[in-house]
Curated annotation (Swiss-Prot):
Any Pfam family: ThiI
Annotated signal sequence range: none
Name of the gene: thiI
Keyword Protease carried by entry: no
InterPro entries documented for this protein: Rossmann-like_a/b/a_fold (IPR014729), ThiI_AANH (IPR020536), ThiI_fer (IPR054173), ThiI_N (IPR049961), THUMP_dom (IPR004114), THUMP_ThiI (IPR049962), tRNA_STrfase (IPR003720), tRNA_sulfurtransferase_ThiI (IPR050102)
Residues that bind ATP: 208-209, 292, 314, 323
Name of the protein: Probable tRNA sulfurtransferase
């Protein structure tokens, strides 16, 4: 493990003598969620991966830091850069972060730090509250911390000529104190994290990437659950414009920003010849179903090649004509392929909200033309056995093999 990492899970905190009170946040508290529920061995592994992912995110945004410390229930980033809290909050597995001031874990030091922050934070007429918690062995309670720190803030405000008010139910301003065994942390804000599990803890999957709104969101949601992705783009040229290809690749590039330290390998598969065969040989209304089944077969071969465990799609039940329950069954009929639909029950508005959050919305809504292979009246209630009969006209195995011979592997 690099020198920037330290493990203090047994000692709980590092030496307070090297910490100084300088009046500005000098550490970021990183909190994680459900990985804390894992067994000791699994939790230890997850935490180490999370630390590496946090370090990679900080490096990708050119945010300096001196150390990452792993302690029981927390990760601490030693930095004075105000961007660090937001950056760490964008790491999968992190539920929240807080830029904090570090001080000694005694009542006097904590009270002095709270008074300093409170004087600059609380304006005339505003109410305040101290939110205190502690861990480790201390000769005082959390209530003692709150009371002593509150008194110090009150006295400091009175010296400033302000008229302080305490409101523990609905205060205008809050000051948080986390008292640990060897250090105390005082902070004013909590930045919400993306949550989930650390990227890379749940293996890898292939994602069918179209560049529309849905597939990037589906990929991101699986990344949030710890899954590394291998994007597969089926190029429908000449039935699709080059703009569609660039849009898909730009979505992949944006997803890459959520996974610093993990380089995607994008597989581009020529799919136009397959569409030409479907249009020329089969009932026109079945083109979309045959197309999707072929994409699954091609993605399955990529899945086996890269050692992945499944295929991710952006399908959402009932969103378009081809995504009826009957059609989605037909798409996998007699195909023993593990398919994941993370958006299956999402409303379009929910998908749009996530796309905006992750930075793919503006890319996915760029004009890119339409696929001209789509029939005027696509099948919405497929006959499963008829689809299989249609495929027997085509020489499916040869088509899959020809497509994979022409695949391009790209680092975008």
């Amino acid at each position: 493990m690099p020198d920037i990492f330290t493990d203090n899970t047994d000692k709980q905190d590092s030496d307070p003598s090297r910490q100084g009170f300088e009046g500005q946040p000098n550490v970021v508290i990183v909190r994680y969620g459900e990985l804390a529920l894992k067994s000791t061995g699994v939790r230890n592994w997850y935490e180490k991966i999370l630390m590496k992912n946090i370090a990679a995110m900080l490096d990708s945004r050119n945010i300096p830091y001196s150390l990452l410390r792993r302690e029981w229930g927390r990760i601490f980033i030693e930095t004075t850069d105000p961007r660090a809290a937001e950056a760490a909050a964008d790491v999968f597995g992190v539920v929240s972060t807080s830029p904090a001031l570090v001080t000694k874990p005694d009542l006097e030091s904590a009270a002095r730090t709270c008074a300093f922050l409170g004087t600059g934070l609380i304006r005339e007429g505003e109410s305040f509250a101290i939110r205190a918690r502690r861990s480790g062995n201390h000769p005082f309670s959390s209530a003692d911390v709150g009371r002593n720190c509150g008194d110090a803030v009150w006295d400091s405000l009175e010296k400033e000529g302000k008229h302080p008010r305490v409101n523990l139910t609905s205060p205008d301003k809050e000051i948080f104190v986390e008292m640990r065994q060897n250090l105390a942390y005082v902070y004013l804000e909590t930045v919400k994290g993306v949550g989930g599990l650390p990227l890379g803890t749940q293996g890898s999957m292939v994602v069918l990437m179209s560049g529309g709104l849905d597939s990037p969101v589906a990929a991101w949601l699986m990344m949030k659950r710890g899954v590394m992705i291998t994007p597969v783009y089926c190029n429908n040229s000449p039935y699709a414009e080059d703009a569609a290809r660039e849009r898909a690749f730009d979505c992949i590039r944006q997803l890459q920003t959520w996974a610093p330290g993990h380089q995607f390998a994008t597989y581009e598969i020529p799919h136009g010849p397959n569409l030409r065969a479907f249009i020329g040989t089969c009932d026109r209304k079945n083109t979309c179903l045959l197309c999707k089944r072929m994409m699954y077969r091609e993605a399955y071969e990529v899945m086996k090649k890269v050692g992945a465990s499944g295929i991710i799609t952006g399908s959402s039940l009932g969103q378009v004509a081809s995504q009826t329950a009957a059609n989605m069954h037909a798409e996998i009929y007699q195909l023993a392929i593990p398919i994941y639909h993370p958006l299956i029950a999402f409303d379009k508005s929910e998908i749009v909200d996530i796309a905006r959050r992750i930075g793919t919305y503006d890319i996915s809504t760029r004009p890119a033309g339409i696929c001209t292979a789509v029939p005027e009246r696509p099948e919405v209630k497929a006959n499963y056995d008829l689809i299989v009969l249609e495929e027997k006209k085509l020489g499916i195995e040869t088509m899959v093999g020809d497509a994979l011979k022409a695949v391009k592997i790209l680092k975008l």
